[in-house]
Amino acid sequence: MICSTPKDESRIHQNTLLRSLQRGFTLTEVMTVIAVVGVLLAIIIPSLKSLSDQAAGATELAAARQLSQGYVGYATDTNGELMPGYLSQSPGDEHYEGNYDVQGPDGNLLGGPAKRRWTWRILPYLDDAVDSLFVNEARQYIDQRRGTDGFAYLTSVFPSFGLNGEWIGGMQGSIYGDLHTLGRFTGQCYYAQRLAEVQRPADQLLFGSSRGGGPQGDSDVEGFFFIQSPYYLTTGWRWAEDEDGGPLYEEPLAPSKSGYLSLRIRGKSATSMLDGSTALRSMQELADMRLWTNQAWKPDWVLDLQNP
């Protein structure tokens, strides 16, 4: 009988291991691994997306709150006067653009539409941080245009949030200034001009996640300086309608048919109220006129010029 030596046993073990490695995995083993990996990915990927959505939502809500605080800070500095969403081009008006000095990105004084929009006028109440106007996807859009000739203009048009300027502060010289124009004909003002006029600041919508049509026919941009209420001043519903004339909330909708609101956070818009509170709201929730103006006493409220 020949006894194996330790060296022989080591060689046998190595040969066995080598043959095992050369053999590789069986089809059953490979399929099992693939199935396990698939299950793990099915669990992990939605979780990662959910975490990403939650982070984006938290970022938007924080930015919306900061904007509301800046807006109220302006009102505090002006003895309760609310910041106009758009300045007038008529010298006789109280909020004539010539009465304002508005600094641009390099400290230079702005003129034209970039000056008239609220965007650059609120920056002194946000520590002059242009970046505070842009979050998530909108930050990428504006970062690509820094240092260009059109930066100040594009910044004024496409902040991440739109102001409810039709009912708060007014849109005097804007194409969205129908409510102001109506008041000039009737001799009344239908939008809030001062903090004291807003009786329920916690119910008064100020800013919302927005989107607008891109410049020169480009695709829509996540951001716009203005958001628009669902009902027109006196005639009723003005957002998108279905075939039967009822409200249509299904995306995608043109910005002008959805109040320039963006539902980019899990199908909702990040909103802030005049008191600084914030919430994610759906289109159905934002279709309630009681959020847009304290004058409204029902969801489908419109101005009644016969019984003011």
Task: Set out the residue ranges of the language-model regions.
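Residue-level signal for well-ordered alpha-helical scaffold segments within enzymatic catalytic domains
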Residues: 4, 42, 46, 50, ...
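Intrinsically disordered, low-complexity segments enriched in glycine/proline and serine/threonine
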Residues: 10-12, 17, 52, 244-246, ...
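Short, well-structured segments within or immediately adjacent to enzyme catalytic domains
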Residues: 60-308
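N-terminal leader/signal peptides at the extreme start of proteins
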Residues: 1-25
